[in-house]
């Protein structure tokens, strides 16, 4: 079956999903979560095959962490589906209502986007998260995962599709692309008369490929080169907490810290404490000359290091003379994802927030909160670094659009 045929079937199924009531979608998502739990053994066995193949190819630790499933992670995925089920349904929500002087009643109403193509790499959880969010928002979804997770994705998709069929919803509403050839993905990205939106999640190469070749509208989940700036007024203990949580808890996450910027006025006191805490957690440090003057045993940081999304236990460090230099560094090397300042200076905090255009800006809070669930959206489909209708963590509302509904009693314009 061609990718165009699959997309057409998904579009037809999306029409069915768009008509489901909020209670029906709630019940459907609960059933999808139960299906994952029922198929847990098969899903974990499939994941073990993917992990074995990935290790044989010498896949790095960050990618292996993203790929891996266990009982706890699978239970978390099922729980996330149930959380999405309980979220308020955005479809049909009236966001504006007005009666014009001529008597017509004008409403802006949220409606589903239609068909969403999700293109991602070694993250089996995205298969379930994307399906849940798209269906809750009344859409069909085409899932094109990476070859690294093909067995895991297939097992998850089969379980979710069974729940759809049992609810009398066409299982094409959740279409998994099993033909992973690049030319098939290219064809999918050309189907702008069928597919309404493409969302790539993965490495920089994948996202650039999708953005450069798509005729379908694209919202990019670009790399997360996230910074922590420790201002001269920062409380040491608070800044250390933000640093450790942001770098060492899950370095493979896109909201983990990659670069530490430290005000020169606090560097001699803060950097030794930071280095000790990070080394205890096996973090490799790389710094500029000013950092090496305080920490002489660390490697030099290159220009490429400051632009890198390591997704690993590696941190680039730079000492800066002031806030303006920190802001200039972030503008040059950042990816518009998430930036953090540790400060007790309210004016500097406000300048930091107002001067950066990143999707998420934090003041005295960990970069790891840059997540749909933590920010109150429920599960997220990605973190948009594209300034379109959605910017930052994308929850349910980002998978809908507003349209006008006008009601009258025969009014004409002329």
Curated annotation (Swiss-Prot):
Annotated EC: 1.2.1.41
An example of a GO molecular function for this protein is: NADP binding
Reactions accelerated catalytically:
L-glutamate 5-semialdehyde + phosphate + NADP(+) = L-glutamyl 5-phosphate + NADPH + H(+)
UniProt entry keywords in alphabetical sequence: Amino-acid biosynthesis, Cytoplasm, NADP, Oxidoreductase, Proline biosynthesis
Q: Write out the pathway annotation from the protein's UniProt entry.
A: Amino-acid biosynthesis; L-proline biosynthesis; L-glutamate 5-semialdehyde from L-glutamate: step 2/2
Q: Name the GO terms of the biological process aspect.
A: L-proline biosynthetic process
EC class (word): oxidoreductase
Cellular component per GO, a single term: cytoplasm
Report the locations given in the UniProt record.
Cytoplasm
What residues form the membrane-spanning segments? Answer: none
Oxidoreductase listed as a keyword: yes
Q: What does this protein do?
A: Catalyzes the NADPH-dependent reduction of L-glutamate 5-phosphate into L-glutamate 5-semialdehyde and phosphate. The product spontaneously undergoes cyclization to form 1-pyrroline-5-carboxylate.
**NCBIfam families for this protein:** PRK00197.1 (NF001221), proA (TIGR00407)
Q: Which family, according to the similarity comment?
A: Belongs to the gamma-glutamyl phosphate reductase family.
Name under which the protein is recorded: Gamma-glutamyl phosphate reductase
Q: Which organism is it from?
A: Xanthomonas euvesicatoria pv. vesicatoria (strain 85-10) (Xanthomonas campestris pv. vesicatoria)
